[in-house]
Amino acid sequence: MKASELKNKSMEELTAKAAELSQELFNLRFQLHTGRLENTAKISSVKKDIARIKTILSEKRG
């Protein structure tokens, strides 16, 4: 997900997407600890997407 795509979204959409990605991160971590996760790089990409969204949200609030 690119930052330029995120800048065009509303605050509500960004908040909803952040919540969705947080849930996905929880599920990925659960899969990692139960030994069912094959693509461990997915965790870091989801974390980076969450950080991008939080950055855009703080820019819009500021």
From Swiss-Prot:
Gene name, Swiss-Prot/TrEMBL: rpmC
Annotated GO biological process: translation
Top-level taxon: Bacteria
GO molecular function: structural constituent of ribosome
Gene Ontology CC annotation, any one: cytosolic large ribosomal subunit
Protease found in the keyword field: no
The keyword Metal-binding is assigned to this record: no
PROSITE patterns, alphabetized: RIBOSOMAL_L29 (PS00579)
One Pfam family hit: Ribosomal_L29
Organism: Geobacter sulfurreducens (strain ATCC 51573 / DSM 12127 / PCA)
Protein name from the UniProt record: Large ribosomal subunit protein uL29
SUPFAM superfamilies: Ribosomal protein L29 (L29p)
Family per record: Belongs to the universal ribosomal protein uL29 family.
Gene3D superfamilies: 1.10.287.310
Upper lineage: Bacteria, Pseudomonadati, Thermodesulfobacteriota, Desulfuromonadia, Geobacterales
Keyword line: Ribonucleoprotein, Ribosomal protein
InterPro entries, alphabetized: Ribosomal_protein_uL29 (IPR050063), Ribosomal_uL29 (IPR001854), Ribosomal_uL29_CS (IPR018254), Ribosomal_uL29_sf (IPR036049)
